[in-house]
């Protein structure tokens, strides 16, 4: 099979592992810089050009779209879909997952466990929003933040008001969430491929930190999931319409709650923590499912 990986950096661990795993299976793998693709949007003859040449017809595309280029990246994926190419994650599913508020609303609609969350536009509503999520300590998040950036733990209501007012003064979109204290700075990353959790790791925040992201200095180890945690991760992926994703879960006193669904999860942490060939399992899925014109919109909203 001829397979394209959409990635801005061919030297990233995830990109290199995917290329290696694909080539070991006899596939031709091309790494394509998403931002260097440009589209010829013509009726009944969609085309993508790259560095002055028309791209060949691929059997499958693996999108590795960074958050900062979501708009352009999803347009490129959509163009591949119009050309009949199988895309591991569809453009609409990537767009859903990148909008944190939209994601939570869709998950909520399907009854999936979530931390209590508030969202408001006007400062007059701040105190009531804080009250509705249970008061401090609480977590304030920028909707556009990634890798733990733009996430603040407010330990008092007064501190929460000050942080929210500051963000609103900067015209930033934020949401306010209850702090799951019983999680003790740990979360679980479930790696879902084709409606199945293929690997999972527990990430622990470093001492004095509440964000468990590995980019923030957290550590990771293999974890055995409960049936409820496994079902929560798979259902969250289905709601988003993602064939491949990382679902981040906290263990709360009311059961597992979903914090985020990541449409472009990194492979390094999960492969090192679990010892599993995650890249190879992704190609297992592609080999079974990649057929021309087989993209079907999954999920709603």
UniProtKB/Swiss-Prot annotation:
It is an enzyme of class 6 (ligase). Mn(2+) 1 binds at residues 248, 260. Its EC number is 6.3.2.-. It holds the Pfam family Rimk_N. Keywords: ATP-binding, Ligase, Magnesium, Manganese, Metal-binding, Nucleotide-binding, Protein biosynthesis. One of its GO terms (cellular component) is cytoplasm. One of its GO terms (biological process) is protein modification process. Belongs to the RimK family. This is Probable alpha-L-glutamate ligase. It comes from Vibrio parahaemolyticus serotype O3:K6 (strain RIMD 2210633). The gene is rimK.
